Amino acid sequence: MRQQYDTSAPPAAFSVADAFMLRTALDALGGVRGLDTLDVACGHGSTARLLASGGARRTVGVDSCPERIRRARAHETGETGEAGAVEYHVADAAGMPQLGPFDLATAVYLFNQAHDRVALHAMFRAVRANLRPGARLLAIVPNPGAFPHVDWSPYGIRIVERTPGGDAPLLRARLETDPPVAFECREWAHADFAEAAVDAGFATVAWQPTRTPPACEIRDEPYWARYRSAPVSSLMNCVA
């Protein structure tokens, strides 16, 4: 569900809303200046760069795809060839090595990639093992139960098929880009995420209300009001 298409294209509405929701949560915590930060499933590095630009003492990005890490590093070095502010590692989230400890971790559409309950719990345990006591995990996760009742295509994503089975239903979907990008993920309930977090050792789990950016010429307030009535994602806030 991460945006794996051409990053020069304008971001989809759901991605814009996610970024705003995450920035708002970070601001409410007082920012990241002086913190050691970790971004899991970092993709091309946009969230990791956000953390680094906010004054984090150390920022580490982790992703299982070598090509996404290559592109993230290329964005960091740019034309100068100098090392960037983010340290990147190729690693599977469920088997992530000890890279910390960190004061804050972020994860955007990571946990819905878990193919079964064992993998889901392993992901949360790997993140928790890299956090200091009292550290925080901010995770953006998709909301379950939308298909076939809600059409998310105006916001940049379409659920094509839902197949029950396994520990969670399989969703086949696509990003409404040009060309479209197909992907699959599991439709975990929020209770499943919370259970895995508590099992991993997080002391508290909370869910923050969906927040959207201010209206603009492209997306007015009625547009965002419709989005908030059935949002793509929620923000999970866990304290170690």
Which positions does each model-derived feature cover?
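Short catalytic micro-motifs in class I SAM-dependent methyltransferases
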Residues: Y109-Q113
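A short glycine-rich, Lys/Arg-flanked "PGG" loop and its adjoining helix->strand segment in the class I
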Residues: H121-P133
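SAM-dependent methyltransferase
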Residues: L138-V198
